[in-house]
Amino acid sequence: MAYKIADSCVSCGACASECPVNAISQGDSIFVIDADTCIDCGNCANVCPVGAPVQE
């Protein structure tokens, strides 16, 4: 089960730098996670200051 980034994302980029498989990239207004690449490690959720990454 992959993570997704909720609308509460503040685009700080903390999650992207912690992703070991580079599944997170900047979208139009918030960061997005490629579900096919995500390995469900939870690093993004652990570092996000607003709790935007959530499991799908």
Curated annotation (Swiss-Prot):
InterPro entries recorded for this chain?
A: 4Fe4S_Fe-S-bd (IPR017896), 4Fe4S_Fe_S_CS (IPR017900), 7Fe_ferredoxin (IPR000813), PSI_iron-sulfur_center (IPR050157)
- List UniProt keywords, sorted A-Z: 4Fe-4S, Electron transport, Iron, Iron-sulfur, Metal-binding, Repeat, Transport
**GO molecular function terms noted in the UniProt entry:** 4 iron, 4 sulfur cluster binding; electron transfer activity; metal ion binding
The entry's free-text remark on the cofactor is: Binds 2 [4Fe-4S] clusters.
Q: Which residues are noted in the entry as [4Fe-4S] cluster 2-binding?
A: 19, 38, 41, 44
Question: What does the record give as cofactor?
Answer: [4Fe-4S] cluster
All copies of the 4Fe-4S ferredoxin-type domain together span: 2-28, 29-56
Superkingdom, according to UniProt? Bacteria
One cellular component (GO) term of this entry: cytoplasm
Protein name in UniProt: Ferredoxin
Q: Which organism is it from?
A: Clostridium pasteurianum
